[in-house]
């Protein structure tokens, strides 16, 4: 290898190492800060806002209103757990059984990819990472998930998740969603309304709370049944999530 190529390789290696250190400090600081402080915006919100501007849409505003857990209906927390991650109170950030099932499903159905992200993983990637699929992103997501599971309580993870989750075009967080779709604060959401919001979470830009399709309605009904099977509101109290 020539001296010039070695120099370039050395420069790239030093640059990548420094970048990794900077990102580690940035993300570590974010995990520590947001363990107690309200989250003003997420990486997904920034990405959506910048994308809108680049496409000439200057009316788009990625909107979110932070609320604490005692300002959110307990039905909402239960609904997202029932819909997205029923083992949330028990696991350490990853649902291994669901991951294995998703991998087996994806091998059989290459055109219908199934995910297995827990609420902790979704919180990590929505808060800190860009949209998309890659092994690099998955690796970073795993590290960030371990970080928030180590530093944050389960209640804190659920609180942040509910405040940064995307519920529609420009609608981020359960308070903004409750005001937009039901004209009430998140604390007043009913069991049915919470289940409807949770029903669009797999793809909130495709599925509409304001005009729910037959699929969304059937998913809402399924979530309501799962909420009942989990035990209703006592489930949240039992696991100190309310």
UniProtKB/Swiss-Prot annotation:
The chain crosses the membrane at residues 19-39. GO terms for biological process: cell wall organization; peptidoglycan biosynthetic process; regulation of cell shape. Its EC number is 2.4.99.28. One of its GO terms (molecular function) is pentosyltransferase activity. InterPro entries: Glyco_trans_51, Lysozyme-like_dom_sf, PBP_transglycosylase, Pep_trsgly. Signal peptide: none annotated. Keywords: Cell inner membrane, Cell membrane, Cell shape, Cell wall biogenesis/degradation, Glycosyltransferase, Membrane, Peptidoglycan synthesis, Transferase, Transmembrane, Transmembrane helix. PANTHER family: BIOSYNTHETIC PEPTIDOGLYCAN TRANSGLYCOSYLASE, MONOFUNCTIONAL BIOSYNTHETIC PEPTIDOGLYCAN TRANSGLYCOSYLASE. This is Biosynthetic peptidoglycan transglycosylase. The lineage of its organism: Bacteria, Pseudomonadati, Pseudomonadota, Gammaproteobacteria, Enterobacterales. The gene is mtgA.
């Amino acid at each position: 290898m020539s001296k010039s190529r070695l120099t370039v390789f050395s420069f790239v290696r030093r640059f990548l190492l420094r970048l990794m250190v900077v990102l580690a400090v940035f993300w570590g600081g974010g995990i520590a800060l947001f363990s107690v402080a309200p989250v003003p915006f997420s990486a997904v919100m920034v990405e959506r806002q910048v994308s809108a501007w680049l496409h000439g849409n200057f009316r788009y505003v990625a909107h979110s209103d932070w609320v604490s857990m005692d300002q959110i209906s307990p039905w909402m927390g239960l609904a997202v757990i029932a819909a997205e991650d029923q083992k949330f109170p028990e696991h350490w950030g990853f649902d291994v059984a669901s991951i294995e099932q998703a991998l087996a499903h994806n091998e059989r159905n290459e055109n219908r990819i199934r995910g297995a992200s827990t609420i902790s993983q979704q919180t990590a990637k929505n808060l800190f990472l860009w949209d998309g699929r890659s092994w690099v992103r998955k690796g970073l997501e795993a590290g960030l998930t371990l970080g928030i599971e180590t530093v944050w309580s389960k209640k804190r993870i659920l609180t942040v998740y509910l405040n940064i989750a995307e519920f529609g075009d420009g609608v981020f967080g359960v308070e903004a969603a409750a005001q937009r779709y039901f004209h009430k604060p998140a604390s007043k959401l009913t069991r049915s309304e919470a289940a409807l919001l949770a029903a669009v979470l797999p793809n909130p830009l495709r599925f509409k709370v304001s005009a729910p399709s037959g699929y969304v309605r059937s998913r809402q009904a399924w979530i309501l049944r799962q909420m009942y099977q989990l035990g209703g509101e006592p489930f949240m109290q039992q696991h100190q999530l309310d």
